[in-house]
A protein has these predicted regions:
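Metal-ion/cofactor- or nucleotide/acyl-coenzyme-handling active-site neighborhoods
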Residues: 2-261
């Protein structure tokens, strides 16, 4: 068996595991579906056709986000963007945090900090948060939920944010999927370097970029292995967006994502 066959087999195993998880969660799906139906309001009330998605790659440190803030467009940021607050006046339309790690003790402070600093943004959270901490439903902030547990996004298929969707890989894949599902016609990527596997230390826009010497939390080989699947999801998302007439433009300088122009 060659490497390509092994790679495709891995994708099938991941997808099968996700489908099994989805079936196991069916008994509790009714509560989730009520939350997801509320996302229809996002689609109906969307004010602009363009959205800027800001990753946290080192290149974002060189972007004047104040210019983005002044554009007639919506914005979406992710994860630890709050650490960039002192560098920009940007108040994002959406703040996506999908990793259940944010519900763990060592990360909950960061989660709460983001909520405290961006009260005027709409937070987009994973429904899996509710299993770990049901109280997030009552947090004092604007929030919606997405569910990404129905298999893996291994081929272009309909994206519907009012229903349980497949898993999309890393947070930027999920952000793009959300933007497509919300009905945006033009999606612009900033700070989506997609290159952390190419450095011996962790790199982000908020902690020194390429000069940062923070210790890695996972090995280079495992991160590259994971990125191979994320790269595949980007290709599928690009094909799906194209079929809908949606433009995805990667404006990240030096980005290693090759799925978008």
């Amino acid at each position: 068996m060659d490497f390509i066959s092994l790679y495709r087999l891995n994708l099938r195993f991941i997808n099968a595991g996700g489908k099994a998880k989805y079936l196991l969660r069916l008994p509790s799906l009714s509560k989730i579906q009520k939350l997801l139906k509320k996302n229809q309001e996002i689609i109906v009330n969307r004010k602009h056709d363009t959205i800027y998605i800001c990753g946290l790659g080192p290149s974002l440190a060189d972007v004047d986000l104040d210019i983005v803030a002044d554009k007639e467009a919506d914005t979406l940021v992710v994860n630890h963007f709050f650490k960039m607050a002192e560098q920009t006046k940007l108040r994002p339309t959406y703040y996506l945090m999908a990793d259940t790690g944010f519900m763990k003790c060592k990360h909950i402070a960061a989660f709460n900090k983001a909520i405290e600093m961006y009260k005027d943004s709409t937070f987009v959270w994973n429904t899996s948060f509710l299993k770990i901490n049901p109280e997030v439903l009552d947090y004092d902030c604007k929030k919606i939920f997405i569910a990404t547990s129905n298999g893996y996004y291994i081929s272009p298929k309909k994206i519907d944010i009012t229903k349980v969707m497949p898993a999309f890989g890393n947070v930027i894949c999920a952000a793009i999927a959300f933007a497509i599902g919300a009905g945006y016609k033009k999606i612009v990527l900033l700070g989506c370097d997609f290159n952390s596997f190419a450095f011996p230390h962790e790199i982000h826009c908020y902690d020194g970029g390429k000069e940062n010497k923070a210790a890695r939390r996972i090995s280079l080989d495992f991160e590259l292995f994971c990125y191979s699947f994320d790269a595949s999801v980007h290709v599928q998302l690009a094909e799906y967006a194209k079929s809908l007439g949606i433009d995805i433009i990667n404006s990240t300088r030096g980005s290693l994502i090759d799925a978008y122009p």
